[in-house]
């Protein structure tokens, strides 16, 4: 039986507290409830409110946690995005105050579960008055891994084991740092499948949350992206992301207004600088539409103007969204390091360049993999596989051009001639077309083997410019005065 606070001296106080247990669930959006009720610990005795304007990309994933059309929410992102604070701690606070129900939180190890309970949750509860007064006053009801509340709801903080995932039913289950879980939990299967089984009793009100930075290697080195939002083939959280509706984070360009993804592919200005600190300070994000440069000081403003788009959707410059979105029972979100609120571009670029230098110096990929996974927020492709893919990438870039024609984009052509002697004397001619930015095409390649001189039998003799200067005249007729048609 739930205990009532012993400090009450009047029957009306007892009745008021008992009556509060029968209140219907609050109708606040989850993010608004977190902003209103959760105090975020900033140290042992310092706290402040949760500020959605710092991490606006968390609002949609957080609010989706109460959407009945989804069975699960999957969030993929680098470290320093505020995902644990908002999605895990915030969801716990929302459940305690607005919609009480049993909840299971699974950390990657028993040690991390204990640490999360003691250093994050205990401080959050202590600094959040509305949470603190709902905790059961009984010492037997609260320990590191189990917490009971006055309304009878129960919070379990566990780790990946079949014992934790068996028997009990929970309306809410949260798996944090998922890619550091074992792929097979005690021989019973993956953690997501085991966890989601715990919520099925509650039907559409049950919800499973998974959040993590990528931590598994790409399994198919020959994979080619089938869509702008598709993740590479990996196990772990990106596999769950691909099952979902595949939402990516977009910014509006401050120059042209078009929406684009703030991802590492669009970072520029930091290569070829031996000073990694200066390189990080010079880093800018480039809009792929107008090639306008965005300074790091604009990140917070653009995050607050950003939107999530599902695969199949497109945002116009005026903010209108068109297209047919991908449908799924899983709402999945993926963002990369350039948009992370608590990591600067200077820090990100410095870590990347230092890790690449360490790889070049030692051949070890461990630091580089950690940076790609946790700072950039991408799955890692081993460098050995990258080298193997270079020929495939070149093949993908091949353009259909008719033979012996000048391709579109050529501004001028150049002829080079190599003189070959010996028994097989000849001129080797190559015609190369040059375009903008150093782009070039091979237009034609051929040999000039025969001169205009004839043997007593009337047969053409091989060229021999060293002995017969008139053989050089062949370059006028067969090279300089020769023409090639345009491809279009």
Model feature map: region roles:
Residues 149, 380-410, 421-488:
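Nucleic-acid-processing active sites and adjacent nucleic-acid-binding tracks
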Residues 2-299, 304-305, 311-413, 417, ...:
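Phosphate/NTP-binding elements of NTP-utilizing enzymes
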């Amino acid at each position: 039986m739930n205990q009532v606070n012993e400090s009450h001296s009047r029957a009306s106080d007892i009745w008021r507290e008992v009556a509060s247990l029968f209140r219907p669930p609050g109708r606040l959006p989850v993010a608004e409830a977190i902003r209103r009720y959760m105090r975020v610990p900033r140290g042992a005795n310092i706290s402040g409110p949760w500020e959605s304007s710092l991490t606006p990309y968390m609002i949609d994933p957080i609010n989706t946690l109460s959407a009945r059309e989804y069975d699960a929410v999957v969030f993929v992102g680098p470290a320093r995005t505020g995902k644990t604070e908002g999605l895990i701690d915030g969801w716990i606070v929302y459940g305690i105050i607005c919609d009480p129900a049993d909840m299971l939180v699974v950390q990657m190890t028993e040690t991390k579960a204990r640490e999360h309970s003691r250093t994050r949750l205990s401080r959050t509860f202590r600094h959040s008055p509305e949470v603190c007064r709902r905790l059961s006053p009984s010492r037997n009801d609260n320990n590191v891994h189990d917490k009971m509340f006055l309304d009878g709801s129960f919070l379990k903080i566990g780790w990946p084991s079949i014992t934790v995932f068996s028997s009990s039913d929970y309306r809410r289950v949260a798996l944090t740092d998922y890619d550091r879980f074992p792929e097979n939990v005690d021989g019973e299967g993956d953690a997501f499948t085991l966890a989601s089984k715990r919520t099925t009793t509650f039907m559409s009100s049950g919800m499973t949350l998974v959040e993590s930075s990528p931590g598994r290697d790409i399994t198919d080195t020959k994979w080619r992206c089938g869509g702008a939002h598709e993740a590479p083939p990996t196990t772990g959280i990106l596999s769950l992301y691909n099952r979902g509706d595949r939402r990516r984070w977009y910014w509006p360009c401050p120059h042209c207004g078009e929406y684009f993804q703030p991802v590492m592919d669009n970072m520029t200005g930091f290569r070829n600088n031996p000073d990694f600190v200066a390189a990080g300070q010079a880093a800018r994000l480039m809009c792929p539409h107008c090639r306008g440069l965005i300074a790091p000081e604009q990140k917070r403003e653009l995050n607050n103007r950003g939107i999530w788009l599902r695969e199949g959707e497109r945002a116009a410059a005026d903010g209108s969204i068109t297209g047919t979105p991908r449908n799924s029972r899983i709402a999945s979100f993926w963002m990369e390091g350039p948009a992370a609120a608590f990591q600067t571009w200077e820090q990100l670029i410095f870590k990347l360049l230092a890790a690449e230098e360490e790889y070049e110096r030692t051949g070890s990929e461990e630091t580089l993999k950690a940076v790609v996974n946790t700072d950039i927020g991408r799955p890692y492709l081993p460098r050995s596989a990258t080298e193997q893919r270079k020929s495939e990438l070149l093949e993908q870039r091949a353009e259909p051009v008719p033979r012996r024609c000048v391709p579109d984009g050529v501004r001028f052509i150049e002829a080079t001639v190599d003189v070959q002697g010996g028994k097989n004397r000849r001129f080797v001619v190559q015609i190369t077309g040059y375009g903008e930015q150093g782009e070039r095409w091979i237009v034609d390649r051929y040999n000039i083997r025969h001169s205009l001189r004839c043997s007593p039998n009337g047969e053409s003799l091989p060229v021999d410019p060293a002995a017969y200067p008139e053989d050089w005249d062949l370059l006028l007729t067969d090279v300089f005065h020769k023409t090639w048609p345009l491809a279009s």
